Amino acid sequence: RAAASIRAFFAYETAAGHLEASPAEGLRRPRQERRDPYILEEEEIRSFLRETEGSSAKQLRDRAMLGLLCATGLRVSELIALKTEDVDVQIGYVRQQARGQERVVSFDEELRLALCLYLESGRPLLLKEADEEHLFFNLSGGALSRQGVWKMIRAYGQKAGIAGEVTPQSLKNSYAVHRLLRESRAVKQRAVRQRSGGR
Protein backbone atom coordinates (compact mmCIF):
# COMPACT_ATOMS: atom_id res chain seq x y z
CA ARG A 1 0.00 0.00 0.00
CA ALA A 2 2.84 2.40 0.82
CA ALA A 3 4.43 1.88 -2.60
CA ALA A 4 1.08 2.45 -4.32
CA SER A 5 0.52 5.67 -2.36
CA ILE A 6 3.98 6.97 -3.28
CA ARG A 7 3.42 6.19 -6.97
CA ALA A 8 0.02 7.91 -6.91
CA PHE A 9 1.45 11.03 -5.23
CA PHE A 10 4.29 11.47 -7.71
CA ALA A 11 1.97 10.70 -10.65
CA TYR A 12 -0.25 13.56 -9.50
CA GLU A 13 2.73 15.91 -9.12
CA THR A 14 3.95 14.99 -12.61
CA ALA A 15 0.50 15.49 -14.15
CA ALA A 16 0.22 18.87 -12.43
CA GLY A 17 3.49 19.94 -14.03
CA HIS A 18 5.40 20.17 -10.76
CA LEU A 19 7.78 17.42 -11.88
CA GLU A 20 9.14 16.46 -15.28
CA ALA A 21 9.07 12.76 -14.46
CA SER A 22 7.98 10.69 -11.51
CA PRO A 23 10.90 9.54 -9.34
CA ALA A 24 8.69 6.64 -8.26
CA GLU A 25 8.54 5.22 -11.78
CA GLY A 26 9.51 1.60 -11.62
CA LEU A 27 8.89 1.40 -7.88
CA ARG A 28 7.54 -2.04 -7.16
CA ARG A 29 6.03 -3.62 -4.10
CA PRO A 30 8.77 -5.50 -2.25
CA ARG A 31 8.41 -9.26 -2.42
CA GLN A 32 7.47 -10.78 0.89
CA GLU A 33 9.34 -13.87 1.88
CA ARG A 34 6.94 -16.77 2.17
CA ARG A 35 7.23 -18.73 5.37
CA ASP A 36 6.28 -22.37 5.59
CA PRO A 37 3.65 -23.20 8.24
CA TYR A 38 5.14 -24.27 11.57
CA ILE A 39 5.23 -28.04 12.18
CA LEU A 40 4.42 -28.93 15.78
CA GLU A 41 6.28 -31.70 17.55
CA GLU A 42 4.07 -34.39 19.10
CA GLU A 43 4.80 -33.03 22.60
CA GLU A 44 3.77 -29.55 21.44
CA ILE A 45 0.48 -30.96 20.15
CA ARG A 46 -0.11 -32.57 23.55
CA SER A 47 0.69 -29.26 25.31
CA PHE A 48 -1.63 -27.42 22.92
CA LEU A 49 -4.52 -29.78 23.67
CA ARG A 50 -3.86 -29.73 27.42
CA GLU A 51 -4.74 -26.03 27.41
CA THR A 52 -8.32 -26.94 26.45
CA GLU A 53 -8.85 -29.29 29.40
CA GLY A 54 -11.67 -28.45 31.77
CA SER A 55 -15.31 -29.17 32.52
CA SER A 56 -17.07 -26.06 31.19
CA ALA A 57 -19.16 -26.35 28.04
CA LYS A 58 -16.68 -24.15 26.17
CA GLN A 59 -13.68 -26.22 27.26
CA LEU A 60 -15.41 -29.47 26.32
CA ARG A 61 -16.27 -28.02 22.92
CA ASP A 62 -12.77 -26.67 22.32
CA ARG A 63 -11.12 -29.95 23.33
CA ALA A 64 -13.33 -31.90 20.93
CA MET A 65 -12.91 -29.39 18.09
CA LEU A 66 -9.17 -28.96 18.30
CA GLY A 67 -8.67 -32.65 19.00
CA LEU A 68 -10.44 -33.41 15.72
CA LEU A 69 -8.28 -30.93 13.82
CA CYS A 70 -5.08 -32.41 15.23
CA ALA A 71 -6.12 -36.04 14.80
CA THR A 72 -7.75 -35.97 11.37
CA GLY A 73 -6.20 -33.17 9.31
CA LEU A 74 -9.60 -31.59 8.64
CA ARG A 75 -9.75 -28.07 7.25
CA VAL A 76 -11.50 -25.51 9.44
CA SER A 77 -14.25 -25.13 6.82
CA GLU A 78 -14.79 -28.90 6.96
CA LEU A 79 -14.78 -28.90 10.77
CA ILE A 80 -17.42 -26.22 11.19
CA ALA A 81 -19.61 -27.89 8.54
CA LEU A 82 -19.69 -31.21 10.42
CA LYS A 83 -23.06 -32.49 11.60
CA THR A 84 -23.67 -34.86 14.49
CA GLU A 85 -24.43 -37.67 12.05
CA ASP A 86 -20.93 -37.33 10.57
CA VAL A 87 -19.24 -38.55 13.74
CA ASP A 88 -19.51 -42.06 15.16
CA VAL A 89 -18.27 -42.01 18.74
CA GLN A 90 -19.03 -45.69 19.27
CA ILE A 91 -16.65 -46.93 16.58
CA GLY A 92 -14.45 -43.83 16.51
CA TYR A 93 -14.49 -42.19 13.09
CA VAL A 94 -15.50 -38.96 11.36
CA ARG A 95 -16.98 -38.79 7.88
CA GLN A 96 -16.60 -35.65 5.78
CA GLN A 97 -17.29 -34.55 2.24
CA ALA A 98 -14.45 -32.99 0.26
CA ARG A 99 -14.73 -32.02 -3.40
CA GLY A 100 -17.67 -34.35 -3.90
CA GLN A 101 -15.92 -37.33 -2.32
CA GLU A 102 -16.48 -38.87 1.08
CA ARG A 103 -13.52 -39.39 3.37
CA VAL A 104 -13.64 -41.48 6.55
CA VAL A 105 -10.95 -40.91 9.17
CA SER A 106 -10.65 -42.92 12.37
CA PHE A 107 -9.48 -41.46 15.68
CA ASP A 108 -8.12 -42.79 18.95
CA GLU A 109 -9.79 -43.58 22.27
CA GLU A 110 -8.71 -40.30 23.88
CA LEU A 111 -10.49 -38.23 21.24
CA ARG A 112 -13.48 -40.58 21.27
CA LEU A 113 -13.92 -39.92 25.00
CA ALA A 114 -13.49 -36.16 24.49
CA LEU A 115 -16.23 -36.18 21.86
CA CYS A 116 -18.51 -38.27 24.10
CA LEU A 117 -18.04 -35.77 26.94
CA TYR A 118 -18.81 -32.86 24.65
CA LEU A 119 -21.93 -34.49 23.20
CA GLU A 120 -23.22 -35.52 26.63
CA SER A 121 -22.23 -32.57 28.82
CA GLY A 122 -21.08 -29.66 26.65
CA ARG A 123 -23.21 -29.46 23.54
CA PRO A 124 -26.60 -29.58 25.34
CA LEU A 125 -25.62 -26.47 27.35
CA LEU A 126 -24.63 -24.54 24.22
CA LEU A 127 -27.57 -25.73 22.13
CA LYS A 128 -30.20 -23.05 21.50
CA GLU A 129 -32.30 -24.81 18.85
CA ALA A 130 -33.44 -28.37 19.50
CA ASP A 131 -33.21 -29.28 15.82
CA GLU A 132 -29.66 -27.95 15.33
CA GLU A 133 -27.73 -30.53 13.32
CA HIS A 134 -24.25 -29.02 13.37
CA LEU A 135 -21.77 -30.65 15.68
CA PHE A 136 -20.13 -27.41 16.81
CA PHE A 137 -21.36 -23.84 17.19
CA ASN A 138 -20.37 -20.66 18.99
CA LEU A 139 -21.23 -19.75 22.56
CA SER A 140 -24.38 -17.96 21.41
CA GLY A 141 -25.63 -21.06 19.63
CA GLY A 142 -24.88 -19.65 16.18
CA ALA A 143 -22.65 -20.80 13.37
CA LEU A 144 -18.90 -20.83 13.93
CA SER A 145 -16.75 -18.71 11.62
CA ARG A 146 -13.38 -19.67 10.18
CA GLN A 147 -11.90 -16.50 11.67
CA GLY A 148 -13.27 -17.38 15.11
CA VAL A 149 -11.68 -20.82 15.01
CA TRP A 150 -8.41 -19.32 13.73
CA LYS A 151 -8.32 -16.93 16.70
CA MET A 152 -9.07 -19.79 19.08
CA ILE A 153 -6.20 -21.86 17.69
CA ARG A 154 -3.77 -18.97 17.94
CA ALA A 155 -4.83 -18.19 21.53
CA TYR A 156 -4.36 -21.77 22.72
CA GLY A 157 -1.01 -21.95 20.95
CA GLN A 158 0.16 -18.86 22.81
CA LYS A 159 -1.15 -20.18 26.14
CA ALA A 160 0.77 -23.41 25.57
CA GLY A 161 3.97 -21.41 25.07
CA ILE A 162 4.64 -22.85 21.62
CA ALA A 163 7.46 -20.94 19.93
CA GLY A 164 6.07 -21.10 16.39
CA GLU A 165 2.80 -19.64 15.19
CA VAL A 166 0.00 -22.19 15.52
CA THR A 167 -2.53 -21.87 12.69
CA PRO A 168 -5.10 -24.16 11.06
CA GLN A 169 -2.59 -24.84 8.27
CA SER A 170 0.19 -25.70 10.72
CA LEU A 171 -2.12 -28.19 12.47
CA LYS A 172 -3.07 -29.75 9.13
CA ASN A 173 0.57 -29.98 8.04
CA SER A 174 1.61 -31.38 11.42
CA TYR A 175 -1.04 -34.10 11.09
CA ALA A 176 0.26 -35.02 7.62
CA VAL A 177 3.92 -35.10 8.72
CA HIS A 178 3.30 -37.22 11.83
CA ARG A 179 1.03 -39.58 9.91
CA LEU A 180 3.78 -40.17 7.35
CA LEU A 181 6.30 -40.74 10.14
CA ARG A 182 4.01 -43.28 11.83
CA GLU A 183 3.44 -45.10 8.55
CA SER A 184 7.18 -45.13 7.85
CA ARG A 185 7.90 -46.60 11.29
CA ALA A 186 5.20 -49.24 10.77
CA VAL A 187 6.73 -50.26 7.43
CA LYS A 188 10.18 -50.57 8.99
CA GLN A 189 8.83 -52.64 11.89
CA ARG A 190 7.07 -55.01 9.48
CA ALA A 191 10.27 -55.38 7.48
CA VAL A 192 12.23 -56.20 10.65
CA ARG A 193 9.63 -58.80 11.70
CA GLN A 194 9.67 -60.38 8.26
CA ARG A 195 13.47 -60.62 8.27
CA SER A 196 13.44 -62.06 11.78
CA GLY A 197 10.79 -64.61 10.85
CA GLY A 198 12.75 -65.70 7.81
CA ARG A 199 15.79 -66.70 9.81
Predicted feature locations:
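Conserved catalytic core of the tyrosine transesterase superfamily
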Residues: 1-199
